[in-house]
A protein has these predicted regions:
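Extracytoplasmic catalytic/substrate-binding loops of multi-pass membrane glycan-assembly enzymes
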Residues: 26-44, 50-62
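Juxtamembrane "helix-exit" motif on the non-cytosolic side of transmembrane helices
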Residues: 30-38, 66-69, 115-125
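Membrane-interface alpha helices of multi-pass inner-membrane proteins
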Residues: 154-156
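Low-complexity, highly charged intrinsically disordered N-terminal segments
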Residues: 71-92, 99
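Membrane-water interface at transmembrane helix exits
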Residues: 63, 67, 95-99, 144-151
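Start-transfer (signal-anchor) and selected internal transmembrane alpha helices
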Residues: 1-25
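Short hydrophobic/aromatic helix or loop-helix immediately within or flanking a transmembrane segment
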Residues: 50-77, 81
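Membrane-interface micro-motifs in multi-pass membrane enzymes
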Residues: 52, 56, 79, 83-86, ...
Length: 156
């Protein structure tokens, strides 16, 4: 028996989500299965680096929430899975925002989102990769809401 909620999801969204996950695994598998340590990862073992002082206030709040679930452990495969899921959801929101109907372009958009150079560079700092993926998701969500519901400053 098929799930009715799954059947309601459009084919474009399914293709975008699965392509983003699949291409992300292919592109970043080495980083997610190996612990590559850089200068910042050694220094920031027990905390997320400069937060409030650099204007990254949400990073501090999110790291406190993540501490409740994971402690101070940096597990690249776990963080990588969360990161890929967040980027896949963001890619699906981009498809909805631009009302894309071509399945090949939807798949390409998901692939571009997950292999973009900033995503690859963020994976070098794996202990904050999921925080920046969440930030990207929030940006795409805001863009989607503005385009769909025409929210502007004058409506507030």
């Amino acid at each position: 028996m098929k799930n009715k909620n799954y059947m309601k999801i459009s084919q474009e969204i399914k293709i975008t989500f699965l392509t983003t996950i699949f291409i992300g695994i292919i592109a970043h598998l080495y980083m997610y299965t190996n612990r590559i340590v850089n200068h910042d990862a050694v220094f920031s073992v027990a905390f997320s680096g400069s937060t409030y002082t650099n204007g990254r206030w949400l990073l501090e709040l999110m790291s406190k929430v993540a501490y409740l679930f994971n402690g101070n452990y940096v597990t690249p495969w776990g963080i990588g899975a969360i990161t890929l899921i967040l980027y896949a959801i963001a890619a699906c929101l981009l498809v909805k925002t631009f009302n894309m109907k071509n399945k090949y372009i939807c798949g390409c958009l998901g692939a571009i989102v997950v292999v973009y150079p900033t995503v690859t560079a963020n994976n070098l700092y794996i202990f904050t990769a999921h925080y920046y993926a969440f930030a990207f998701l929030l940006v795409t969500l805001a863009t989607y809401l503005i385009s769909r519901y025409n929210y502007t400053m004058k409506n507030i």
